[in-house]
Every structure is written in structure tokens, then in C-alpha cells.
Regions:
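Cytosolic/matrix-facing juxtamembrane and C-terminal tails of multi-pass cellular membrane proteins
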Residues: 170-215, 220-223
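Intrinsically disordered, low-complexity segments enriched in polar/charged residues with Gly/Pro
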Residues: 2-4, 154-155, 192-193, 199
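A generic helix-loop boundary/linker signal
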Residues: 51, 55, 157, 196-197, ...
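Transmembrane alpha-helical segments that form the membrane-embedded catalytic/substrate-channel core
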Residues: 8-25, 53-57, 154-182, 202
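Short, conserved, surface-exposed binding loops centered on an aromatic residue
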Residues: 138-144, 156-160, 196
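Extended, compositionally biased low-complexity polar/Lys-Gly-rich tracts
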Residues: 65, 151-153, 188, 193-194
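Non-catalytic, topology-defining segments of multipass membrane proteins
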Residues: 1-151, 218-219, 224-315
């Protein structure tokens, strides 16, 4: 069963994630009668056996991760950690687990429930949490009467997918560079992989995914062309011939010389291999805030305050 659900090279698991991800991004992907009766097939049905809480992409992924582009308050936030440290990665895994089970996202939506949109996301995700934690295991146990079957088919994939997404996100958002105004540079904090080993529907172009999400996966090269000047200027995070899982591990274990030699694409053609390694290592260690300070920020209601400040600025 492990070979069946994970697949060789994790491709079945990756495909299940990819299709659920695409459904979350495309609320009109199915006809109205399908949306009202079955909903998102991979996100809300198949996903129960792949560690995915129903509605997690529709709610948390869209209204936290993409709204904040990985910034403070995101359930996937990681810029309070040293991405070149495997020890810091161990602090990140529980954060992803809290996201996967729905707890952290529910708490974030609840704290911002004054917004009708966020209140709607709270109750939608709450429905998904109840389905995943009560309905799904109840049905499986009712049919099989086997706790072992329940562990292997339902709980184990949750643990595996948690680690998988932690590694993937560790790679996708590993690097931080600030421009002359102190703002994060988009072509650095979300990376692009060219000729990737496991690309599915343009998932490897995470830069386009965040900063031009309307771009269809066959057209991401057009967005790359638009970003070329910035990529050259800031030595953007562009890599080649590597999977995001492999890259995540290479970053985690501080293998920047190997990344520089084999995978980094220097569009400026001005940097030596060692300069690239030093630059990437430095960017992987840049923090927006210290880990303990970020926890204090969360406890003090930083998310709600930031949302109010952003709304006031917009008005």
C-alpha cells in the first residue's frame, strides 16, 4: 500500500497534492451542479486518504499563504528560521503539522472573524476538519474494524504529507533578499526550477505561482521573460535540473556549493561558483524576526492588527 499511495519517487503523493492544489486555486473548475454536490474531488474526497483536510486549499492556502505570500501570519511562515539548518527545520515541521490538521488555520481565521470573508473561511475549514477527524475515520473503522488499517490508510499519509510539504516549502521559500527600500524581492523569495525532474502543471515555477497566479502553466516562460531584468539585477532564485524535494534537502543540509555548481542559473553571468554559494547561504539565513519574537507576535494578536492596518492603509 505504501508503494501504491506514495508512488515511485513520491509521484502519486505529489500528483494528489498537485490536483488538490489546482482545485483550490480554481473555484470554477467544475460545473455548478458538480461543485454543489461533490465539490472538489481531489481536495475534499481523495485528499482524505492523502493527509489533506477537506477545504484546506480553498481556505488556508488561498486566504493565508497566497494573501500573505508566505509572510508573517501565514500558517506556513518560515522566515523566523535559518533555512540552512536541519535543526531549525525540526521547529518548522510541527508548524506544518498544525497547518495540516487544520488547527493553526482555524485559529487564524477565528482571530480575524470580524471580516465576513475570514469568518466564511473559518466555518468552511471547520467543516473540513470535522469530516477529516470524525467522519472519515468513523466510516473506515466501521467498514474494517481494524485500528491498524486506520493507521496505515488514514493517519500515516497525514504524517508523511506533513513532512513532504515541510521539505517542499523549505525549498520554495528558502531565500530572502531585501531591496534598497527594505522590501522583499519577489524573484528571490519564491524560486523557479527549469527542466525540473518532477514538475507537474508548472508547480516548479513558484515565482509565477505567487506573483502571477493567473498565468497558465504552459505560459510561465512569458512571466519569466517579464521578470528577467529583476532576475539579472538581484541574482534571482532560478535553478535547473533538480526536484524541489532534492533542493529542499540540499538547502536544509547546507549544501550550497553543490547547488551553486550543479543547479543555480546565473543570468548575470558575473558570479563565481563560490560567490553563488556564499550568496545563497547568506540569503537562507536572513530572518524577518526571531523565532521566539514571532511566537510573541502571534500571542499578542499580531495577525489581526496587521490585517486592520492593511485595511486602513487601503482605505
Amino acid at each position: 500500500y505504501n508503494c501504491a499511495w506514495a508512488g515511485f519517487g513520491g509521484r502519486v503523493m505529489g500528483a494528489a497534492y498537485t490536483f488538490a492544489h489546482k482545485e483550490g486555486h480554481n473555484p470554477m473548475i467544475y460545473r455548478k451542479w458538480v461543485r454543489r454536490s461533490l465539490g472538489n474531488f481531489f481536495e475534499n474526497w481523495v485528499g482524505n486518504l492523502f493527509g489533506n483536510v477537506p477545504y484546506n486549499f480553498t481556505t488556508s492556502h488561498m486566504h493565508l499563504h497566497h494573501r500573505l505570500d508566505g509572510g508573517m501570519g501565514d500558517s506556513f511562515y518560515m522566515w523566523d528560521l535559518d533555512r540552512s539548518s536541519a535543526w531549525d527545520f525540526l521547529l518548522f515541521v510541527p508548524r506544518i503539522f498544525s497547518h495540516m490538521v487544520g488547527v493553526s488555520s482555524l485559529a487564524k481565521f477565528w482571530r480575524q472573524r470580524a471580516s465576513p470573508l475570514m469568518c466564511k473561511q473559518f466555518y468552511l475549514l471547520l467543516r473540513g476538519v470535522l469530516i477529516f477527524w470524525f467522519v472519515t475515520p468513523g466510516l473506515l473503522y466501521g467498514v474494517t474494524r481494524s485500528p491498524f488499517f486506520l493507521f496505515v490508510v488514514w493517519l500515516q499519509p497525514l504524517l508523511c504529507m506533513t513532512f513532504f510539504l515541510a521539505v517542499v516549502n523549505w525549498g520554495f521559500h528558502a531565500f530572502v533578499h531585501l531591496d534598497e527600500n527594505g522590501e522583499q524581492v519577489a524573484c528571490v523569495n519564491s524560486l523557479t526550477i527549469l527542466d525540473g525532474l518532477d514538475d507537474s502543471f508548472g508547480e516548479d515555477d513558484h515565482m509565477a505561482h505567487h506573483y502571477s497566479p493567473q498565468t497558465w502553466y504552459t505560459k510561465t516562460h512569458e512571466f519569466q521573460a517579464k521578470m528577467h531584468v529583476d532576475i539579472v539585477k538581484y541574482h534571482g532564485s532560478v535553478f535547473k535540473e533538480v526536484s524541489i524535494v532534492e533542493l529542499g534537502f540540499l538547502i536544509m543540509f547546507n549544501q550550497f556549493e553543490r547547488i551553486a555548481e550543479k543547479h543555480f542559473v546565473d543570468h548575470s553571468r558575473t558570479l563565481s561558483c563560490q560567490q553563488v554559494a556564499d550568496m545563497l547561504r547568506s540569503r537562507a539565513r536572513v530572518k524577518e524576526i526571531e523565532y521566539d519574537d514571532y511566537l510573541d507576535w502571534l500571542r499578542e494578536g499580531g495577525e489581526a492588527k496587521a490585517a486592520k492596518a492593511k485595511l486602513a492603509k487601503a482605505n
